[in-house]
């Protein structure tokens, strides 16, 4: 229908280890087909615009896993074969009209290149996006992944651009508002550290010096990055959504970006 054509529906197949989803099975051709059929039924649609692979079977360094990340236990031939079979299945599903584009998530530079090269074997098929964490405090995408995605024409869909709401300052001074995310996840998946608390305080002061709301600074900064496709934000209520949308036309000037980079150099990788 015309109304459906106006929508862009994106969903994922969950990765290995989610015991409540497919008994924790990883991402394999059979699992992909079952998951897509389930999503089509649940979403009551004939096709999915963007279908994403949530987490590599081999694991990755995201969600603060880079502090102890060790890829040497991986078997290169096994990983390459899995990627080959997964891409073939996704291509078949595209030919069947069930998906339009494919994306990665929580992927590494090596994994992105493998998927991109495999997709090039098929006509009119490529990796459209990668959904990884990116924010004022989390900028590990800026190096190898930025270069990889530039050359492979893969756009970043940034999740947690507001650092789980931390950038607002509502958790400073050990505050834990009732029903907040921090009240449910005590360390916010490793985001709550002395350095992140210090950095957030300084970004809030930076926002004030330019008469900006820290939410607008955070989202506008992400949008300013050359590799950005879109920014995924969350809002728990209408007031939060109104505040976010109020800054949709804000574009940061060079002097603001220079101060952001200066602060990031001062407190690099704060979480």
What are the residue ranges of the model-derived segments?
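Acidic (Asp/Glu)-rich catalytic clusters
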Residues: 1-8, 41-44, 94, 116-123
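Beta/alpha (TIM)-barrel catalytic core signal, keyed to glycine-rich beta->alpha loops juxtaposed to Asp/Glu
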Residues: 56-262, 267, 271
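Outer-envelope exported proteins of Gram-negative bacteria
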Residues: 8-10, 49-52, 101-105
């Amino acid at each position: 229908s015309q109304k459906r054509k106006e929508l862009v529906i994106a969903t994922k197949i969950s990765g290995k280890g989610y015991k409540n989803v497919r008994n924790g099975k990883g991402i394999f051709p059979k699992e992909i087909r079952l998951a897509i059929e389930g999503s089509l039924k649940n979403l009551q649609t004939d096709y999915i615009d963007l279908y994403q692979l949530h987490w590599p079977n081999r694991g990755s360094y995201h969600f603060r896993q880079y502090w102890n990340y060790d890829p040497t236990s991986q078997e290169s031939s096994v990983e390459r074969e899995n990627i080959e079979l997964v891409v073939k299945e996704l291509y078949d599903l595209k030919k069947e009209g069930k998906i339009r584009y494919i994306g990665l998530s929580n992927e590494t530079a090596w994994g992105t290149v493998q998927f991109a090269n495999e997709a090039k074997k098929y006509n009119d098929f490529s990796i459209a996006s990668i959904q990884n964490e990116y924010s004022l405090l989390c900028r590990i995408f800026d190096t190898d992944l930025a270069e990889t995605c530039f050359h492979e024409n893969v756009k970043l869909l940034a999740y947690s651009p507001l650092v789980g709401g931390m950038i607002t300052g509502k958790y400073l001074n050990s505050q834990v508002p009732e029903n907040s995310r921090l009240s449910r996840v005590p360390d916010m998946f490793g985001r709550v550290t002395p350095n992140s608390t210090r950095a957030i305080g300084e970004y809030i002061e930076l926002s004030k010096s330019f008469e900006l709301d820290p939410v607008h600074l955070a989202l506008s900064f992400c949008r300013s990055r050359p590799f950005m496709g879109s920014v995924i934000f969350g809002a728990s209520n209408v007031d939060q959504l109104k505040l976010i949308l109020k800054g949709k036309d804000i574009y940061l000037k060079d002097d603001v970006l220079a101060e952001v980079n200066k602060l990031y150099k001062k407190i690099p990788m704060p979480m």
